[in-house]
Regions:
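Conserved, well-folded catalytic cores of nucleic-acid-processing
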Residues: 36, 55-59, 74, 89-96, ...
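Active-site glycine-centered loops adjacent to acidic/histidine catalytic or metal-binding residues
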Residues: 67, 135, 165
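Canonical P-loop GTPase G-domain recognition
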Residues: 128-129, 138-196, 200
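Catalytic P-loop NTPase motifs of RecA-like helicase/translocase cores
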Residues: 48, 72-73, 106, 140-141, ...
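Conserved C-terminal guanine-recognition region of P-loop GTPase G domains, centered on the G4
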Residues: 57-62, 81-161, 232-235
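P-loop NTP-binding site
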Residues: 200-307
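Conserved G1/Walker A P-loop phosphate-binding module
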Residues: 2-91, 95, 100
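Conserved glycine(s) of the Walker
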Residues: 25, 171, 263
Length: 307
């Protein structure tokens, strides 16, 4: 008699585009799934400017997760490019993951209600299954959750709704299963040990920009960009990185440098810690600050930044 062969588990793979309002926790979720920091996170909205691609690989699945800039009403050239990047990602997606901050409904319900038509407009553009992740439920009381689910259910027929907390990890395994079961059967596109297709140069520039966001106020974070001028790897010594921080005005340059260079020194030291963790080796980082008037409207610079 022939032994009955055990069927091999089907392999699922595809693209999940993560969209949603600014500061909802999209980058935090991606970093949690990858168990490492490839997307920067700050308390400020519109931190993410570029599309970040994370690769989440399991025994029988591979998710190519696109972390996109937050959807918002854009007026400036750079902001319009950010929204364009987010919406274009939907064209590549097998699944759209709409990530919303559930706690916003309890903190500023009128503000969320005013965005009803805006959210509906974005979601009407989606041509694939759409999963809703209600993030930050760790900030809610249990009785607050159901009305929030009802509100979001009224704006779009989501394929699934998953309450979760990207920061605490609650519900993230459930969300992952929901995504995997809806992915098509397909091949493994990337090796197991590849967490992203972003270059180390790009991630380093983002880590520096994150430190600027965390240490400056008002318009300063939104008026800065980071360009990596050189990235030199040495077999025996530290990686040597030279980077330029662009600002739009001379007054902003003074703020970033700080008294006796203290602010710039603090930014550099904090960035080096994360860069060394990323690269797994010692790093030496040199930073310069340069004024480039109206760079946020300069298409050549925006292209250089990948926007």
């Amino acid at each position: 008699m022939h032994q009955k062969q055990t069927a091999q588990p089907k392999y699922h793979s595809g693209v999940v585009a993560v969209i949603g309002p600014p500061n909802a926790g999209k980058s935090t979720l991606l970093n949690r799934y990858l168990n490492q920091k490839i997307a920067i996170v700050t308390p400020l909205p519109q931190t993410t400017r570029n599309r970040i691609q994370g690769i989440i690989t399991g025994d029988d699945y591979q998710i190519i997760m696109l972390d996109t800039p937050g959807l918002h009403k854009a007026k400036e050239t750079i902001n319009k490019e950010m929204v364009r990047i987010a919406l274009e990602s939907l064209g590549e997606a097998d699944i759209a993951l709409f990530l919303a901050d559930a706690s916003a409904m309890t903190i500023a319900p009128k503000k969320v209600e005013r965005r009803r038509n805006e959210y509906q407009g974005y979601l009407e553009k989606v041509r694939c299954p759409t999963v809703l992740a209600l993030n930050k439920i760790d900030l809610l009381e249990p009785e607050q959750l159901l009305p929030i689910i009802d509100w979001y259910s009224s704006i779009h027929p989501f394929t699934a709704i998953v309450p979760m907390s990207a920061l605490e990890g609650e519900g993230t395994d459930i969300l992952l299963k929901e995504l995997v079961t809806r992915l098509p059967e397909g091949p493994q596109y990337y090796p197991d040990d590849i967490p992203t297709d972003s270059t180390e140069r790009f991630i380093v520039s983002e880590l520096i920009r994150e430190k600027i966001f965390l240490r400056t106020q008002q318009e300063i974070p939104y008026s800065t960009a980071v360009l990596i001028d050189s990235f030199q790897e040495n077999e025996k010594g530290p990686v040597v990185i030279h980077a330029t921080i662009l600002v739009e005005r001379g007054s902003q340059k003074g703020i970033i440098i700080g008294k006796n260079g203290k602010m710039l020194g603090d930014i550099r030291k904090a960035a080096v810690r994360d860069v060394e963790k990323l690269l797994g080796c010692k790093a030496r980082l040199q930073l310069w600050v340069k004024v480039k008037k109206n760079w946020t409207a300069n298409e050549q610079i925006l292209r250089e930044l990948g926007l």
